[in-house]
Amino acid sequence: GSTDMAIGNAIGSVTANTGMIMAISLIFLPVAIRMSQFAVKGVLMVVSTLVLWLLCRDGVLSLPESMIVLALFVLFIIENIRSAKKLSAEEHTDGAAVVDKSRKALLKNLALFVLGAACLVVGSNLLVDNGTVLAQLLGVSERIIAVTMVAIGTSLPELVTAITAIVKKQSSMSVGNILGANIIDITIILPLCALISGDGLHIAEQSVQQTVYLDMPMCALVAAIAVIPTILHKRFTKLQGILLLALYIAYVFVTVRI
């Protein structure tokens, strides 16, 4: 159905997560990072945005192209498993408490996962349906609603995590959460939409120019600004946060004006 809503929401969420929420974290709190973990996931985020942009330049994410993007998700899962094993080994070395592996704990976490997934499906349907109606009422394209209001709405969990991290002074928690959410948005949500449709994901003709030449490049740009200087200098800076936030505000302004 709402192709513009799906694409705009995924791309807009990544841009909002990085340009607004990560920016706020960097401005208000010095962020300590595990460079070995950040570098791989950060590069994967940048590569994912660039690959998606290149594949969609003709206005279509075809089924074979969807498989290429999904392959990046597989790499993300492999990296998560690798880093989790390494972290677990370090914790055992430090004498940390072992995670409760009882059947009761497993069932509890499984139930919470299913409940969370169900709420996510219901919430996503409400966002898309009401976003479409809102676009019609305001007389604007679904893309504009998707990359601004819907994207910010779906980024609220990351915003809550960022605020909690700032209050508790646990900055790395916020950054790690944002990286993971961004990679998932790009590498699984859009490819799955393309596969479910049966013939790929087609950007609406009236939105191709803005999506391919504004939304996706901006998404790649904020990802690059968040990642590349950090890897080169081995730390985040407040200047990065200010630049990211300024770019995001400018992007939203341009988006609603064109």
What residues fall within each predicted segment?
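Hydrophobic alpha-helical segments, chiefly the membrane-spanning helices
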Residues: 1-258
